[in-house]
Amino acid sequence: MSAVPDDIAADFIIEAQEILDRLGEQLVSLEHAPEDSEQLNAVFRGFHTLKGGAGFLAINAMVELCHAAEDTLGQARAGQATLQARHFDAAQQSLDYLQSMLDAFGSGSEPPRAPQQLIAQFATSG
């Protein structure tokens, strides 16, 4: 873990946990109503915010996974892609990995990387 002041790390952990908790509910709602642009925007913002905080703290594993989700969601927001069942599956699995990464960061360990197969599931083609 990088030399980050304890209060900044603690604030990130609290905020990231709240975002992860919300994302779980928001993803279920979005999967049931994929045309709901408000819900799509909320899910995009959740991954975007996690990526930004993780980037600031150099949690590269978290940045990589959030970036993959954010790219796919961004394409869907722009009307350039349609979210498929595999995207929702990948997003739900990502929450588990992101939680593991957050737990590792909180305990001072190196966060585990997500499997490349999971990141590849976010691809909008194929």
Enumerate the language-model features and the residues they cover.
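Non-catalytic helical tethers at domain boundaries
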Residues: M1-G126
